[in-house]
Design a protein with these regions (language model features):
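A short helix->loop->beta-strand "cap" motif at the edges of active sites that frequently abuts
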Residues: 7, 28, 86-90, 123
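Substrate-binding/gating loop at the entrance of the active-site cleft, primarily
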Residues: 11-28
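Conserved core segment of the aminotransferase class I/II
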Residues: 120-211
Length: 212
């Protein structure tokens, strides 16, 4: 919807199959490839061959992913970031298993090593953080999205025309899309999730160690 002609989502599999089911419900198209066969530098040629067609609106992947538990390396994330900027594609990172590559001691707030993310290499990103695995808080069905500031504030005429709003990406996403298609959750759940995030940020709890 941001850019006319960009009508497909590209999945780097394996990922969360429900995401494809959601696209099926709304009639959206997608392409997919298995990341196992395109690790490292090989990912560049594969992505370029798909993105160069000009019809991909977003790339989505889980990192780490389930069930293969493949963890993308910095080289691969840099490739994704570079090409998403080149072809104006939004990177959607599903971080349900945030910091859970236990080979590296992630989880210490504001201290290296920092969790890997394509957000280091592009401004076109949305990070999705579900509480289900991070805090084992699955029953309440709450999550958070983090939109890159440049993308959030970017104006798209197609969004303005479609939703009769400002056409600012972040405003359209929140007020004209998410508000309409999500059921929301109770205030108590929102406060609980916010408090768990704060305690983690303050270093009072170590959710990575708790989930190990």
């Amino acid at each position: 919807q941001r850019i006319p002609g960009k009508k497909k989502v590209l999945f780097s599999d394996p990922g969360f199959p429900i995401q494809k089911s959601q696209l099926r419900i709304i009639g959206a198209e997608w392409e997919e490839f298995d990341i196992f066969s395109y690790r490292g530098a090989a990912l560049s040629d594969k992505l370029e061959s798909i993105l160069a067609k000009g019809d991909i609106a977003a790339i989505i992947y889980s990192n780490p992913n389930n069930p293969a538990w493949i963890c993308l390396e910095e080289e691969e994330l840099a490739i994704i970031g570079r090409l998403s900027t080149k072809y104006d594609v939004v990177v959607i990172e599903d971080l349900a298993y945030f910091c859970m590559d236990f080979r590296t001691p992630f989880g210490k707030p504001f201290e290296p090593p920092y969790p890997p993310t394509a957000a280091r290499y592009t401004n076109n990103y949305i990070l999705m953080l579900s509480s289900s695995k991070i805090f084992s808080y699955a029953g309440q069905r709450i999550a958070m999205i983090c939109v890159g500031e440049e993308l959030f504030n970017r104006h798209f005429p197609a969004l303005e025309q479609r939703y009769n709003d400002s056409g600012i990406f972040g405003q359209s996403l929140v007020a004209s899309i998410l508000y309409m298609i999500t059921s929301g959750c109770t205030v108590s759940t929102q406060y609980a999730y916010a408090q768990m995030l704060k305690l983690s940020s303050d270093g009072a709890i170590d959710f990575v160690e708790d989930t190990r």
